[in-house]
Amino acid sequence: MLPLYRFPQEASALQERLVRHVSFDEAAHKAVDEILAKVRQQGDRAVLNYTEQFQGVRLTSMQVDEEAIEMAYRHADPSLIATLHEAYANIVRFHEHEVERSFFYEAEGGVLLGQRVRPMERAMLYVPGGKAAYPSSLLMNAAPAKVAGVCEIAVTTPCDATGVVNPTILAAAKVAGISSIYKIGGAQAVAAFAYGTESIPKVDIITGPGNKYVALAKKQVFGHVAIDSIAGPSEVVIIADESAHAEFVALDMFAQAEHDPDASAVLITTSESFAQAVQQAVASLLPTMLRHETIASSLLHNGAMVLVPSLDDACAVSDMLAPEHLELHVVQPWDILPKLKHAGAIFMGSYSCETIGDYFAGPNHTLPTSGTARFFSPLSVRDFVKHTSIISYSPEQLRSKGAQIAAFADAEGLQAHAEAVRVRLKTL
């Protein structure tokens, strides 16, 4: 089921199969462009029409009332609520370490310079709905926004055909202290919050994963609002040596593959016998999985095993893929960590499975995909703040440096820039 590649002999074939890029087909572009245009022109009417078309329900109100949120929280399994609270506390605690402070300093000659860090005013957090509920996505998006100090936070998630939002998502919203929840999804939800409608406020940033239409809509509205990233299918790379446990690896690969047939799971190992053991574990465990068809399709079309001569080569292959998740099932994971350059999150050792990061540990699970870990980072407090430079020159400081500054502007051929300095020098 999982094709085996030998590196470096089959490097080109491996790259062709596994190197992924964010791309969208022409039909998706056409559909999303039409949705964005109609929502921008027609506001609520277009959003309600698209919700009826895609979600199968004609809403009379797009917002979830607070009573429904309270009821979902009260009726939820108490042990789940306790876990949600503990997980959220872990996520908040991690993101508190990311908080940046404004700074000022006195430069040469008494010039005052600084940078002010301020939270964005409004954020929309998109939480996927449909076949599965993702309260973890709500917690992961809410925590950095809250820690950053965003004033108004709205969540939107698709309701079902009866107009009801998954109660576990509502309970998670209560845990995160969010009461502004909308029950719309898809590109129409992205458009509504990017442009604003009669009943939906325009926001400053949209974050959170979704299907290809949500991802493309976020890409298209960037510039009207900020976005976190453009999410593609989920992916994991596992580097393993002969000390690894085959069932651990097989189930960790399944954990990615069960998301989506387009998800990718790749094992890179120095041991051919271990690769064979994982193949056997996959064959044995697959029939026991509830989503065995999705897993099988994902592994068949987007999975692989890569046999490498050394762990240094394993690191090179991983960096070529720049995966969303990277697990290190090796004797000394900390020894190879410095050799790895590109990954959204790295899980150290056989007992640090990716599931822990998805739900509980604290670092954000909203991660760069499709090779974008080469230049993008996990969702963080930094996504929800903006930076403003502060510059203060006194008359004396301008008198000292003004001629130099004006000459610099002259060198660029920008007369008005230069004269804006010289006119001030004439008053000194």
Swiss-Prot record:
GO terms (BP aspect): L-histidine biosynthetic process
Cofactor note: Binds 1 zinc ion per subunit.
Residues that coordinate or bind Zn(2+): Q256, H259, D358, H417
Described function: Catalyzes the sequential NAD-dependent oxidations of L-histidinol to L-histidinaldehyde and then to L-histidine.
Chain sites annotated for binding NAD(+): Y126, Q188, N211
Keywords, sorted A to Z: Amino-acid biosynthesis, Histidine biosynthesis, Metal-binding, NAD, Oxidoreductase, Zinc
Root EC class: oxidoreductase
EC number: 1.1.1.23
Active site residues according to the UniProt entry: E324, H325
UniProt-listed SUPFAM superfamilies: ALDH-like
Binding residues for substrate: S234, Q256, H259, H325, D358, E412, H417
Domain of life: Bacteria
Gene expressing this chain: hisD
Name this protein carries in UniProt: Histidinol dehydrogenase
Catalytic activity: L-histidinol + 2 NAD(+) + H2O = L-histidine + 2 NADH + 3 H(+)
GO cellular component: a single term: cytosol
Family label: Belongs to the histidinol dehydrogenase family.
An annotated Gene Ontology molecular function: zinc ion binding
Pathway: Amino-acid biosynthesis; L-histidine biosynthesis; L-histidine from 5-phospho-alpha-D-ribose 1-diphosphate: step 9/9
Cofactor: Zn(2+)
